Regions:
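Catalytic domains of carbohydrate-active enzymes, especially glycoside hydrolases
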Residues: 10-31
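Short, flexible loop/turn elements at secondary-structure junctions
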Residues: 1, 30-32, 131
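Conserved small/polar residues in nucleotide/adenosyl-binding loops
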Residues: 197-203
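Active-site-proximal, well-structured secondary-structure segments within enzyme catalytic domains
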Residues: 66-192, 196
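Mature N-terminal, pre-catalytic/accessory segment of carbohydrate-active enzymes
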Residues: 1-9
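Acidic, His- and aromatic-enriched active-site or binding-groove loops in soluble protein domains
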Residues: 43-65
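Short secondary-structure boundary/capping segments
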Residues: 5, 35, 40-47
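Short, solvent-exposed turn/loop segments enriched in Gly/Ser/Thr/Pro and often Arg
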Residues: 27-37, 199
Length: 204
């Protein structure tokens, strides 16, 4: 009901359907965050998950959002059509509220998630924060050559400090995505079903 399919009830219902039909494999398109053109095969990261797939009903159940906050957004009028421009605005508006409520509350779990994914998560979160800072333009068009080309430790730390709120946001969204994805994957395994995803063409 909120613009795009998610890792929520519909996914579990489909898993049950596969199980009832005697199927043991669910093949999916890449699950990474999409870039310009919204193709799942062109992603900002090989490792990150797409925040669009975070289920908002589960966030309501978890106390991170209210139903009024979710239903007040414009998700489009055609349930068969994904309006990526619209859900970009609407999703990040409500996901920001979820982060504002959950970042401190979930800090112990988030810290463990960060440690487990330290090889890619800090760079991804900083890259996305910088991309937002520079108007979502391609990194080749960023105004600051120091972050665009040289990426010295000092410059990276400068931008981590400057963009701390957005770095936290993109970190927390990955935490939420993988918490929901891992629960769905565990449910699939309980049904003796495995999921396969295609590889993406990463840009980071």
């Amino acid at each position: 009901p909120y613009g795009i399919g998610t890792l929520g009830k519909a996914a579990y219902d489909f898993a049950d359907f596969l199980h009832a039909a005697g199927q043991h494999c669910w093949q999916m398109l890449p699950l990474g965050p999409t870039s310009y053109g919204d193709s799942p095969y062109q992603s900002f990261s090989t490792y990150a998950g797409n925040p669009y797939f975070i289920d908002l009903e589960l966030l309501i159940e978890d106390g991170l959002l209210t139903r009024d906050e979710v239903e007040s957004q414009n998700w489009g009028t055609n349930p068969r059509y994904v309006d990526y421009g619209r859900i970009y605005e609407s999703r990040f508006a409500v996901l920001q509220k979820a982060k504002d409520r959950g970042w401190e509350r979930d800090q112990a779990e988030v810290a463990a998630f960060q440690a487990e994914n330290c090889r890619w998560l800090p760079d991804y979160a900083l890259y996305m924060a910088c991309k937002r800072h520079f108007g979502m333009r391609s990194w080749t068009e960023w105004d600051d050559a120091d972050i665009r080309l040289r990426r010295s430790p000092e410059v990276l730390e400068q931008y981590r400090t400057l963009l701390r709120e957005d770095v936290e946001l993109f970190t927390y969204l990955q935490f939420l995505f993988f918490r929901q994805w891992n629960r769905l994957r565990d449910y699939l395994h309980s049904l003796d079903t495995v999921s396969y995803t295609h590889l993406t063409l990463p840009t980071t």
